[in-house]
Every structure is written in structure tokens, then in C-alpha cells.
Amino acid sequence: MAGAIKTDRWKRGMSNPLSRIATRVAYGASQLPRVAWYVGHSLAMRRLAETARRRDGGAARQHAHTKAPVPDRRRLYADMAMLFWQDLANVEAGLYPLPADHDGSLFTLIHRSRLFFEDLPAIHRRRERRAHNEVLSEETRGKRPRYYLQNFHFQSGGWMTDDSAERYDTQVEVLFNGTANATRRQALPQLREVFAGRDQRKLRLLDLGCGTGRFLDLLKQVWPRLPTLGLDMSEPYIRHAKRHLKRWSWMRFIVGKAEAIPVPDNSQDAVTSIFLFHELPPKVRRIAFSECARFLKPGGRLVLVDSLQHGDQPDYEGLLDLFPQNYHEPYYLSYTNEDFCALAADCGLTYIRTVKAFVSKVMVFDKPATKTGHPHL
């Protein structure tokens, strides 16, 4: 209950005008430098890519293209601002405390920035040559499913190396212009609905595809004593997550596949998955979704955070076309056309709502409660 008490105290403090002003100043002081840092990386990355293309004497491939509308930079920045206003509104409403992004020390930021820029030439080379199978080798073959052994995002090492895990969060924040953590936090109000008034120590949550543990870090800031299980197929990413989350207790991690999750039926009060489902082949994606339904308790909640899909935001349609062309995302197109409401119905889950969050969205599903289940709604 400690996390809930802390959040309630924070909410009461928001009724004080001075506290509200202080909160807004603190929020801006933490988020604006992050955005500037990662937008700066994004602009530098684009300039370096253009320089590399001119140096190479033109394109070695057909460049990304779309006939669908693409938002201009002014629109993108306006929608980024809307996401941050929503993030701040959630803080002021007491849905979660003023967040700490835990990006690390200045030395750590510079180290990860160096790793990011050092990998750009190799990423450019792979993108121009459409090379994405360097991860597949005699050493890795058979250790992971074939669909997993690729250079996703054209990054070195795919998901299979410690350097990849160290670079990953910088790459994602650059791609999202510093909004990735704010996007992840939009899942927290959906969990608060089902956790409110309950002893967090007696609940269970599984984060599917936990990666480097950034969402679990944000989750623990609200429910520090909530027992959580992080599952990922990458041992290096799990190792990174353990280091990043060493400040928290009540945590376990396992290496495993989303399509064969080693947990009992009806064992989890909530399941979360952040930016995973667009990385899965259609068949695996549907099996993974059914697995989530299997081990959710009656009355439990599934919260997915992932990319927008076709039809969600008409003037963003072009971005959905360009993304898999610029970044190696072989299963993204099928994801953008996946009917998750139909999947939910087939698995016995009830669709609750979708909340848009800049270029992403939060999808919420519940497993109907039995007569003895927890009536959280």
C-alpha cells in the first residue's frame, strides 16, 4: 500500500496552487532537457545520413516513399506537446507521482551517446544494402526462433549483444524524440483502475518483452512492492534490466518466448507489453495474445502499448508506411492491420478502450471476472 499512499498524498498536494506550480516547474525541468537531448541526436543522425548518401554518390536502394499523408514537423511537435500535457495532467490528478526517468549520470549519457553514433555508419550500410541477417550465424541458429535472429532497426547485434542492450534506450528515445518514457507512462492509469484499493503485495504482474526494464522502472515508482515478472527472449537485455532495476525489490526475470510463456493459467492480475507486438510475425503475435489471456486471472487486465495502426490517425498514415522502410521491421505492416478486438474476442477477453499517445496507443482488455473474481470496474 506504500505506493498508493504516496500517490494519494501527492494528489492532495496538487490542490495547493504553489504545489501545482512547483510540480509544473519540476516536470518541465526534467522533460525539456531530455527532449532537447534526443531531438538533437535525431537531427544530427539525419544530417549524418544525408552526408553519407552524398558521399556514396546517390542511393544504392529505392528510398522510403509513401502516397499517404505525412505530418510536418510543426504538427509532430504539437502532438508531442499534447502527450507531455497529458503526462503532466496524470501527475496532477494523482495517477502517478512526478516521474523519474533514471537516464543515468552525465557520464552514462555521454557513453550511450557515443555508442549510438558509433553504430550509425553500420546502420546506414545495412539500410542501403537491405542487409538484416548478420545476427543469423551457426552460433545463434537454433538458440532462438528464426524470426528473432535479425538486425531489427538495422542495429548491430540485433537483440543478441550487450552493446545492443546498452544502445537500445538511446535509439528508441531518438526515434521518439524524447517521448518514449512519457508514452510508456500512459499505461499506468489503466493499471491504476484495477489496482486501486487492493494490497499491491498480493497482486501479480507480468511484463511481456520487458527489454531493458524501462517500463518496469516507471511501474515500480507507483507500486514499489508489487511482485513483477519480466520476460524477454534476450539474455543481454535481461542482464541490462537487472542492473537498471537494482534499486527495486519484488522483481523476477525469466528468459523465454512470448508464444510459450512458462507461467501457470490464471496466475497474473495484470499483463503489460510495451512495443513488442509489432515485432512479432502474425502467427506468433496471435499465439502470444492468446497466452496473455491464458494466464490472466478472471478480472485481470491486459495493457498493450504499441504503434498506431492504419485507420487510427488519418494524417499519420504515411508515417506508418515509412517506418518499416527506414527501419528493418518485417512484421510491422501486418501489425498495422491486425484486428486486436477480434483477437480479444477469440481469446475470451473484453476490449475496454484505446488511448492514443503521440505515434503510439494504449490498448486495454479485461478477462471477465467470475462470481468470485475481483470486480474492478
Regions found by a protein language model. Give the residues of each.
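Core SAM-dependent methyltransferase catalytic element
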Residues: 347-377
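Class I SAM-dependent methyltransferase SAM/SAH-binding core
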Residues: 206, 214-260
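N-terminal accessory segments
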Residues: 2-142
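Conserved class I S-adenosyl-L-methionine
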Residues: 201-211
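Conserved alpha-helix/loop element of class I SAM-dependent methyltransferases that forms part
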Residues: 167, 178-201
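A short glycine-rich, Lys/Arg-flanked "PGG" loop and its adjoining helix->strand segment in the class I
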Residues: 286-298
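C-terminal alpha-helical "lid/dimerization" subdomain adjacent to the S-adenosyl-L-methionine
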Residues: 286, 303-347, 351-355
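A short acidic, Gly/Pro-enriched loop at the edge of an enzyme's catalytic core
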Residues: 259-271
